[in-house]
Amino acid sequence: MKLRITRFAFSVFASLIASVVVSAALTVATYNVENYTLANRMVDGVYRENYPKPEKAKAALRRVIGAIAPDVLAVQEMGPQPFLDDFQRELKQAGLDYPHAVLLEAADADRHVAVLSKVPFKAVKRHADVPLTYFGKPERVKRGVLEVVLATDQGDVSLFVVHLKSKYTERKDDPESALQRALEAEAVRDLVLTRFPDPARARFIVAGDWNDTKGTRPARALQKRGDTVIGTLVDAHDSHGETWTHTFRREDLYSRIDFLLVSPGLKPSVPGNGGKVHDGAGVAAASDHRPVSVVLDLTPVR
């Protein structure tokens, strides 16, 4: 009896360890799921107000996510908690089980950032009030910053999820909200540096929809402050070698505005061929964005 109990206890302990610590490879993806909430939209040629994401688009989302099979999925444009619960439940029904999920509700009442994961979070930090000064007045990063910590065989890895201000103009003296977006990026950068003052020794990812291209002030701000390198963008392309992640359908414009940025301390875990922009079946029907993913090599150093 004692032997059986000991074996059972060891089995439970081993199972717990396996469920908490990530070893070998970890696939991380970022995906703007385009209004997974109530929104005004065209549905089958009819304009609908406060209408949920159509079932066809939701089915396409699940197909896309299933093809990538990320271990950790950073999401933008998620609705309030009931919508995340619905998303998580329908993924599970499709054979995509993400038992760990967290949502950040910040200043934007309609669209939020979230993380779904196959592995448990060691820690969750909801940075809902990230301050900035905009035209002399105190403001905050509209959608906040969601941080989750994952335990791996090479040490903890932190994931910061952001969705910077869109290009919708809210003030005539800030066309396309360029200044607000840049200030948000700088506030996010300062938060990351507060958490990790020495990025060269840190292991983190900044993921999400930055609503600007890689040569712009927001993207530059997130990569470097003064002489301090915060991170580098993961090179990513689709099966045709194209790098765009967003389409503005009305104007037929294609751009890369969704990114995965890795700290210098985590960069050795990124494979030589970088990441991927998914262009498989269902991607056009699922969202106006394409997901970006990377497989991190977290094999313990011997």
Go through each PLM region and give its residues.
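Metal-dependent phosphoester-hydrolase catalytic domains
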Residues: 140, 190-205, 211-302
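N-terminal, active-site-proximal structural segment of metallo-dependent hydrolase catalytic domains
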Residues: 7, 21-94, 105-108, 185-189, ...
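Structured beta-strand-rich core segments of catalytic domains in phosphoester-bond hydrolases
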Residues: 78-164
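Sec-exported extracytoplasmic/periplasmic mature domains
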Residues: 66-70, 74, 83-96, 121, ...
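Second-shell loop/turn segments in exported
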Residues: 46-52, 69-77, 101-103, 134-135, ...
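Bacterial N-terminal signal peptides that target proteins for export
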Residues: 1-17
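Metal-dependent phosphoester/phosphodiester hydrolase catalytic core
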Residues: 153-183
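Catalytic metal-binding/acid-base residues of hydrolase active sites
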Residues: 34, 78-79, 163-165, 210-213
